[in-house]
């Protein structure tokens, strides 16, 4: 084997240093990945745990920052010249590609943590050239320091770019604290080659080359590995606008955009700037993560002529859409319908379309004496030839004011979809209008219940006849919808009682209907008996009921504990609830309630870890919650799987004690997910369990945690830690409590 001059470029070479060598994942590729529960450790943050980004942002001279960004737009640098003397198009693409990785299925991706700075996003084929965009911004980031995060700066710069070219944006909110390491929780697909898609379609089984009839795996929202959305040349490079429309509708829909928002974003975004395909793609050097150290984090060094300016290659396409690419206009739509289009190729050999019988009047980006014919991408033509998109596009063409408003709103949604509720919005340009996709909840407009009221209500709830397990199950079902990824869900709003959550299979159970009915009666009785307008919301009452039941379970186990409770939640209405958007949040599996099963590609315990990460739980928090929820008898269907106790309903460490009992032998029954535990001597049946239960004995790291709670001195710690983890989940969405924002989660 030939030796490489640079070991960094030869993966078969193993560095003889700590952390190198064959890893556990190399030996056992299918081992459970717990690393996503250990992300964003405070020690990784150079700003320290005490740094309050929201306070820092609010101390920023915001409009001075915007002025500096606007000045940069036309300050062309020799090392990376601006197209048409204006960086607007480049910065719009940068912001779009930062925010556009968001997907509604799991809330991951998006611009919230500035992940475009890190692999793999910084090296995706779709992000060629954005390394230069971020470096252009460095002097501004350096000037304002920690008062502006990279996450906010990337998106704000896109907003300022639009404004600098004459477009009126809808507004902007800051508040995105930077992350300091790669987000390993995001699944970008199973392919091992850039631009591949042989795994993501139809479960990797069906003919993924049938571009007219294939299904993209959830939660993925891109047609190819390394692209933000779709191949602009058409599906798999086939210049078919109709087939491309199918891919567009799927991928933009996975990003929470409807057809009108999709048309507005494509037509609006392609009003500005150009694509780059001046020379062959094989003239581009390695991407940033593979580039030589001397490149200092830049990549794709271009050896074609000057490699920049008029000789730039990024996507390989060479298209300028409008006559005024640095000004807002309706020209994209005008040209789309004015001309017939014929297929051609860019200088780099990529499929694109040229206007038939058109004069050359489109400006060159660097030579004023040169003109070009109008050009379009295959995906642009989808807006004309897909019948649904065409209807919207023609309306926008005929009503430019509607187009501008739709683009402004869709762009705002694109940039803010993963920021969370309006309680997290900060800055002087936050729009006053409340939008449905922000999952609004009413403001508190009444006196809240006191500690004495809460105590009385807890007694009334426990005396209502509803099983404590049902109270706990309802509280968990409400609060555990929270996703730390996009900060959606949670107990605030009590949407557990509304469509679609109440119809979800995991929730459509007798215990939920009974509990809600009783709690609504208690609420009505309490509220009508109060003077001075004091009220308790169903949202608060659901959580309070869970608190009461957990406290009772601890008392019954011999431990007097007080589970924290802070009122202030309000009740959302059905009209405030976007049914489609919340439907995308329905869990495929929820191992905390022993709901769901393994598939041919995902084991049940992997769904459990995925859910725990979305709940921002650590591995100890995951373990203690599972152990507690099992002995509290809260399986969604009332089954006894994993209920390793002879005293269900008491908050004991029995789950761990009995799981670790060597007198029990386990065997698989009923498929891959169900197990039976029998006495090793007598063979008598003792327990049944699922993979969600037994993983705490089979996985070495989880077993180590289970042993702490299953030891003779583990009971008191178990109760204490369960209460802390329970309280954390109940309050994950309580941004109104003004908890200090942090990219790290609480650790046991």
Curated annotation (Swiss-Prot):
Gene Ontology CC? cytosol
Question: What CDD domains is this protein classified in?
Answer: catalase_peroxidase_1, catalase_peroxidase_2
Modifications the protein undergoes after translation, according to the UniProt entry: Formation of the three residue Trp-Tyr-Met cross-link is important for the catalase, but not the peroxidase activity of the enzyme.
The record's free-text note on cofactor binding? Binds 1 heme b (iron(II)-protoporphyrin IX) group per monomer.
Q: What induces it?
A: Induced by temperature shift to 37 degrees Celsius, the condition whereby the pathogenic yeast phase is formed. Expression is also induced in oxidative stress response and during infection in the murine macrophage.
Which co-factor is required? heme b
Cross-link type Tryptophyl-tyrosyl-methioninium (Tyr-Met) (with W-96), residue numbers: 229-255
* E.C. no: 1.11.1.21
Catalysis: reaction(s)? H2O2 + AH2 = A + 2 H2O; 2 H2O2 = O2 + 2 H2O
* Keyword Secreted part of the UniProt annotation: no
Q: What is its main location?
A: cytoplasm
Please name the GO terms of the biological process aspect recorded for this protein, alphabetically: cellular response to hydrogen peroxide; hydrogen peroxide catabolic process
Site feature: Transition state stabilizer = 93
Q: Which Gene3D superfamilies match?
A: 1.10.520.10, Peroxidase, domain 2
Q: Name one GO molecular function term.
A: heme binding
Key words of the record? Cytoplasm, Heme, Hydrogen peroxide, Iron, Metal-binding, Oxidoreductase, Peroxidase
- From the record heading this protein, give the residue positions of the covalent cross-link Tryptophyl-tyrosyl-methioninium (Trp-Tyr) (with M-255): 96-229
What SUPFAM superfamilies does the annotation carry?
A: Heme-dependent peroxidases
Q: Where is the active site?
A: 97 (proton acceptor)
| Consequences of knocking out this gene | Reduces the fungal tolerance to hydrogen peroxide but not to heat stress.
Q: How does it assemble?
A: Homodimer or homotetramer.
The record's annotation in PANTHER family points to:
CATALASE-PEROXIDASE, HYDROPEROXIDASE I, BIFUNCTIONAL CATALASE-PEROXIDASE
Q: Please give the function described in this protein's UniProt entry.
A: Bifunctional enzyme with both catalase and broad-spectrum peroxidase activity. Plays a crucial role in oxidative stress response during infection. Acts as an antigen and elicits antibody response in P.marneffei-infected AIDS patients, healthy people working in mycological laboratory, and healthy people in an endemic area.
Q: What is this protein called?
A: Catalase-peroxidase
Organism ancestry: Eukaryota, Fungi, Dikarya, Ascomycota, Pezizomycotina
């Amino acid at each position: 084997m030939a030796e490489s001059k640079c070991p960094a470029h030869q993966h078969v070479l193993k560095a003889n240093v700590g952390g190198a060598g064959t890893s556990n994942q190399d030996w056992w590729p299918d081992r459970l990945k717990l690393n996503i529960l250990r992300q964003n450790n405070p020690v990784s943050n150079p700003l320290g745990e005490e740094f309050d980004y929201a306070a820092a942002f609010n101390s920023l001279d915001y409009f001075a920052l915007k002025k500096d960004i606007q000045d940069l737009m036309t300050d062309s640098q020799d090392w990376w010249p601006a197209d048409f003397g204006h960086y607007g198009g480049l910065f719009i693409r940068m912001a779009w590609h930062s925010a556009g990785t968001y997907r509604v299925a799991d809330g991951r991706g998006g611009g919230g943590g500035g992940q475009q700075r890190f692999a793999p996003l910084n090296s995706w084929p779709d992000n060629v050239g954005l390394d230069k965009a971020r470096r252009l911004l460095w002097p501004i980031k350096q000037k304002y320091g920690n008062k502006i995060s990279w996450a906010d700066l990337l998106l704000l710069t896109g907003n300022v770019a639009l404004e600098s070219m004459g477009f009126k944006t809808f507004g902007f909110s800051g508040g995105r604290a930077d992350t300091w390491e790669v987000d390993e929780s995001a699944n970008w697909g199973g392919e091992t080659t850039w631009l591949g898609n042989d795994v993501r379609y139809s479960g990797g089984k069906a003919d993924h080359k049938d571009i007219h009839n294939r299904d993209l795996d959830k939660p993925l929202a891109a047609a190819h590995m390394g692209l933000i959305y779709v191949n602009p040349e058409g599906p798999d490079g086939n210049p078919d606008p109709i087939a491309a429309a199918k891919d567009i509708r799927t991928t933009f829909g996975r990003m929470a955009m409807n057809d009108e928002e999709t048309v507005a974003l494509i037509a609006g975004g392609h009003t500005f700037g150009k694509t780059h395909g001046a020379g062959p793609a094989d003239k581009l050097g390695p991407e940033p993560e593979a580039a030589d150290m001397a490149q200092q984090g830049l990549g794709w060094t271009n050896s074609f002529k000057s490699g920049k300016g008029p000789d730039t290659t990024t996507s390989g396409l060479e298209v300028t859409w409008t006559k005024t690419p640095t000004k807002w206009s309706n020209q994209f739509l005008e040209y789309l319908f004015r001309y017939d289009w014929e297929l051609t190729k860019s200088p780099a050999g990529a499929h694109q379309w040229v206007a038939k019988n058109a004069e050359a009047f489109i400006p060159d980006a660097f030579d004023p004496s040169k003109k070009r014919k109008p050009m379009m991408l295959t995906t642009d033509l989808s807006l004309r030839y897909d019948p649904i998109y065409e209807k919207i596009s023609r309306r926008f063409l005929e009503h430019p004011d509607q187009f501008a408003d739709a683009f402004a709103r869709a762009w705002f949604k694109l940039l803010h979809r993963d920021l969370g509720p309006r309680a997290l919005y900060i800055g002087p340009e936050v729009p006053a209008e409340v939008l449905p996709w922000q999952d609004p909840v009413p403001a508190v407009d009444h006196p809240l219940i006191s500690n004495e009221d809460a105590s009385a209500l807890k007694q009334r709830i426990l005396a209502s006849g509803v099983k404590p397990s049902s109270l706990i199950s309802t509280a968990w079902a409400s609060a555990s919808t929270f996703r730390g990824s996009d900060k959606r869900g949670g107990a605030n709003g009590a949407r557990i009682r509304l469509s679609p959550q109440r119809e979800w299979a995991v929730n459509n159970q007798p215990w939920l209907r009974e509990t809600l009915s009783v709690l609504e009666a208690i609420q009505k009785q309490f509220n009508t008996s109060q003077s001075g307008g004091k009220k308790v919301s169903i949202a608060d009452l659901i959580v309070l009921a869970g608190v009461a039941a957990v406290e009772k379970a601890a008392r019954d186990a011999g431990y007097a504990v007080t589970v924290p409770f802070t009122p202030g939640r309000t009740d959302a209405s059905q009209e405030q609830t976007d049914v489609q958007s919340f439907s995308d949040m329905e869990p495929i599996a929820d191992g905390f309630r022993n709901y769901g099963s393994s598939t041919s590609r995902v084991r049940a315990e992997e769904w459990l870890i995925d859910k725990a990460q979305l709940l921002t739980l650590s591995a100890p928090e995951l373990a203690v919650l599972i152990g507690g929820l099992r002995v509290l008898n809260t399986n969604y269907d009332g089954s006894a799987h994993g209920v390793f106790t002879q005293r269900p309903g008491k908050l004991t460490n029995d789950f761990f004690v009995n799981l670790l009992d060597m007198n029990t032998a386990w065997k698989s029954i009923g498929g891959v997910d169900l197990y039976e535990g029998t006495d090793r001597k007598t063979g008598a049946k003792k327990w049944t369990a699922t993979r969600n239960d037994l993983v705490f004995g089979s996985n070495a790291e989880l077993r180590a945690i289970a042993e702490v709670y299953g030891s003779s001195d583990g009971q008191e710690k178990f109760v204490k830690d369960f209460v802390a983890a329970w309280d954390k989940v109940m309050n994950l969405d309580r941004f109104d409590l003004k908890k200090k924002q942090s990219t790290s989660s609480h650790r046991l």
